[in-house]
């Protein structure tokens, strides 16, 4: 069930903060093995998604409904935040965070385009009826 913009802003901001704090609290454990560094990148991409949601909800509250996130500054700022948080854990976490974030961003864009883009009607050329050049 969907919630309002203000509630979504509060929830995504809280989840971003908790995820960042959890990543910092368990940074030694996340950097200890190969699989946990991949998990650290996955957590970083979750931080990217939640911070992007919070940032876009804030813009919708300030600028009005229908304001969409663009690549610069919204997506790049949230991506740099997530990459920085992952970099505090391990350098491999940065790479996996980037890969997981790009996959997540692709699916977010795909879902939002099917939900929010208006269908454009397909224009077919009409057959011209009229006097044409006669051939012998």
Curated annotation (Swiss-Prot):
<feature type="topological domain" description="Cytoplasmic">
    <location>
        <begin position="109"/>
        <end position="136"/>
    </location>
</feature>
<comment type="subunit">
    <text>Component of STT3A-containing oligosaccharyl transferase (OST-A) complex. STT3A-containing complex assembly occurs through the formation of 3 subcomplexes. Subcomplex 1 contains RPN1 and TMEM258, subcomplex 2 contains the STT3A-specific subunits STT3A, DC2/OSTC, and KCP2 as well as the core subunit OST4, and subcomplex 3 contains RPN2, DAD1, and OST48. The OST-A complex can form stable complexes with the Sec61 complex or with both the Sec61 and TRAP complexes. Interacts with PSEN1 and NCSTN; indicative for an association with the gamma-secretase complex.</text>
</comment>
<dbReference type="Pfam" id="PF09775">
    <property type="entry name" value="Keratin_assoc"/>
</dbReference>
<dbReference type="GO" id="GO:0006487">
    <property type="term" value="P:protein N-linked glycosylation"/>
</dbReference>
<feature type="topological domain" description="Cytoplasmic">
    <location>
        <begin position="24"/>
        <end position="34"/>
    </location>
</feature>
<dbReference type="GO" id="GO:0018279">
    <property type="term" value="P:protein N-linked glycosylation via asparagine"/>
</dbReference>
<keyword id="KW-0256">Endoplasmic reticulum</keyword>
<feature type="transmembrane region" description="Helical">
    <location>
        <begin position="76"/>
        <end position="108"/>
    </location>
</feature>
<dbReference type="GO" id="GO:0008250">
    <property type="term" value="C:oligosaccharyltransferase complex"/>
</dbReference>
<dbReference type="InterPro" id="IPR018614">
    <property type="entry name" value="KRTCAP2"/>
</dbReference>
<feature type="topological domain" description="Lumenal">
    <location>
        <begin position="56"/>
        <end position="75"/>
    </location>
</feature>
<comment type="pathway">
    <text>Protein modification; protein glycosylation.</text>
</comment>
<keyword id="KW-0597">Phosphoprotein</keyword>
<keyword id="KW-0812">Transmembrane</keyword>
<dbReference type="GO" id="GO:0030674">
    <property type="term" value="F:protein-macromolecule adaptor activity"/>
</dbReference>
<keyword id="KW-0472">Membrane</keyword>
<feature type="short sequence motif" description="Prevents secretion from ER">
    <location>
        <begin position="133"/>
        <end position="136"/>
    </location>
</feature>
<feature type="transmembrane region" description="Helical">
    <location>
        <begin position="6"/>
        <end position="23"/>
    </location>
</feature>
<feature type="transmembrane region" description="Helical">
    <location>
        <begin position="35"/>
        <end position="55"/>
    </location>
</feature>
<protein>
    <recommendedName>
        <fullName>Dolichyl-diphosphooligosaccharide--protein glycosyltransferase subunit KCP2</fullName>
    </recommendedName>
</protein>
<comment type="function">
    <text>Subunit of STT3A-containing oligosaccharyl transferase (OST-A) complex that catalyzes the initial transfer of a defined glycan (Glc(3)Man(9)GlcNAc(2) in eukaryotes) from the lipid carrier dolichol-pyrophosphate to an asparagine residue within an Asn-X-Ser/Thr consensus motif in nascent polypeptide chains, the first step in protein N-glycosylation. N-glycosylation occurs cotranslationally and the complex associates with the Sec61 complex at the channel-forming translocon complex that mediates protein translocation across the endoplasmic reticulum (ER).</text>
</comment>
<keyword id="KW-1133">Transmembrane helix</keyword>
<feature type="topological domain" description="Lumenal">
    <location>
        <begin position="1"/>
        <end position="5"/>
    </location>
</feature>
<dbReference type="GO" id="GO:0008047">
    <property type="term" value="F:enzyme activator activity"/>
</dbReference>
<comment type="similarity">
    <text>Belongs to the KRTCAP2 family.</text>
</comment>
<feature type="modified residue" description="Phosphothreonine">
    <location>
        <position position="124"/>
    </location>
</feature>
